[in-house]
Regions:
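Residues forming the flavin
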Residues: 1-408, 414, 418-473
Length: 473
């Protein structure tokens, strides 16, 4: 027999944690499984236990409140666990996860997916050099360990995260060589009406930019990194001006640095929902391919709910509220007496979504941006495949990401295609003169996360193996 519960939740970020707290408050036996050591997700990531004290930030304050709420609730939090397979057995969900090097499983009547997002980083010549890190990875490093990516850093990318990362680097004592962003000042001005729904966050963003400008840090608007150079590590970055479609235009500028942070928006981590049979649709304003789900997390499959960035990139504030809505709806599906109607919560979710979607809109790369990916740029890091390798597959007839994967192994490495498949889809769309929404996402396959053979085999003695007798002569 395996342990069973009413509600199982994958992910303990703003969405998953609040879904769990809400479901538990309605009397449901609730279990949250999360990869991290502490709840909070990326946005509210906890400091390392080795750090005894640190200046308080809004993220630390909100994260600590969340962790206290979880500790005071009746839910069970399973930390440092990676879900690698989900199955449906009769009327119950069965979740297989790796913890302490072994595969365990639990059963649940209802499943809530709060799997969050992954960062899209467009490949650039030199992006595999030591010293290059994603914007999201840099925030994790700084929030958890209070460490800067390097001594002198170029921060490059789209949307608001470049300004947050640059501000945090300065706060922690690092040097920002420059900020390089494809966005223009006009892009930000056009987004202002939607950002007015969260004046507090808008004000905070203004403070970031003002502090950076007062510190004399150059901001290269409507620019992008063209190449990262160095023999064994980052030594310099070439940046170039962009046209309105973000294609390179004009001469390159050289910036000396020993580290680079780069990122180009977020995408819903929808592999688990697709694996379970949820249809996805292309919504550029939500980051690309997203699962079909209602505002309260309800899906077409009974007993399956999705919330947070895994349902579309609307930002942490919206994810927190949608988690509460999904937790209520999940509790209602088990305990009919639960009142799941909450108009005030729904209206708050819609307001927060407008702000988050405005930020997503600023983060989405435009069509000309991929011209920065040269033929000799590594696209698939796991298999060391270049853009020219991908285009060779397309020329032989591969018109989908699945076909490119079959012919080249792109996406078959440890990351499961999370680094390369979006870029490959963009390359296919460009070569076939199609819109990206015409290029279906790759078909997800188990395991959802890398899993070792030893974890699956469990503990056994070689003497227990049944060895057949030698065949008679």
């Amino acid at each position: 027999m395996i342990e069973t519960c009413d509600v199982a939740i994958i992910g303990a970020g703003p969405a998953g944690a609040n879904a769990g707290i809400m479901a538990a408050s309605q009397g449901c036996h609730t279990i949250i499984i999360d990869e991290q050591a502490m709840p909070g997700g990326q946005i509210w990531r906890a400091k390392s236990e080795a750090i005894k004290s640190a200046p308080m930030t809004p993220e630390i304050i909100d994260g600590d409140k969340l962790r206290v709420s979880i500790a005071e609730s009746n839910l069970t939090h399973i930390a440092n666990a990676r879900v690698w397979q989900i199955e449906r057995e009769l009327d119950e969900w069965v979740l297989h996860f790796i913890i302490n090097g072994r595969s365990e499983k639990i059963g649940a009547k209802v499943l809530i997916l709060a799997t969050g997002a992954r960062e899209y980083v467009q490949p650039t010549p030199g992006w595999t050099l030591p010293g290059v890190i994603g914007l999201a990875g840099a925030t994790a490093l700084m929030k958890r360990d209070l460490l800067t990516p390097g001594k002198r850093t170029v921060v490059s990318g789209t949307g608001p995260l470049v300004f947050f990362v640059a501000s945090e680097i300065r706060r922690l004592g690092g040097e920002v060589a420059a900020i390089v962003t494809p966005n223009s000042r006009a892009d930000w001005l056009r987004a202002l009406p939607s950002m007015s729904y969260r004046i507090d966050l808008l004000r905070r963003g203004f403070v970031w930019v003002a502090d950076l400008l007062l510190a004399g840090i150059p901001i290269f608007w409507r620019h992008a990194k063209k190449q990262i150079d160095g023999e064994t590590k980052v030594q310099s970055v070439k940046v170039t001006k962009l046209g309105n479609d973000w294609s390179p235009k004009g001469p390159a500028h050289l910036l000396e640095a020993d580290s680079v942070c780069l990122g180009h928006g977020l995408q819903a981590a929808s592999e688990a929902s697709q694996l379970l049979g949820i249809d996805v649709k292309y919504q550029l304003e939500l980051g690309g391919w997203v699962p079909e789900v209602q505002e309260d997390g309800i899906t077409k499959i009974n007993g399956l709910f999705i919330c947070g960035d895994g349902a579309g990139i609307r930002g942490a504030a919206a994810a927190e509220i949608q988690g509460k809505l999904a937790g209520l709806a999940a509790a209602k599906s088990i305990r009919p007496e639960v009142n799941s109607s909450n108009l005030a919560l729904l209206n708050s979710y819609r307001r927060a979504s407008r702000f988050g979607m405005a930020m997503t809109g600023l983060s989405i790369p435009r069509k000309g941006f991929q011209k920065l990916i040269t033929q000799e740029t590594i696209v698939c890091r796991c298999e060391s495949l270049l853009r020219c390798d991908i285009e060779n597959e397309i020329e032989t007839g591969a018109a989908t990401t699945n076909a490119v994967k079959s012919g080249s192994r792109a996406g078959m490495g440890p990351c499961g295609g999370k680094y390369c498949q979006s870029t490959i889809a963009k390359i296919i769309a460009d070569r076939e003169n199609q819109s990206e929404e015409k290029i279906a996402p790759p078909t997800p396959r188990p395991p959802l996360r890398p899993v070792s053979a030893s974890a699956l085999s469990g503990e056994f003695e070689y003497t227990d193996l049944q060895i057949p007798k030698p065949a008679p002569l």
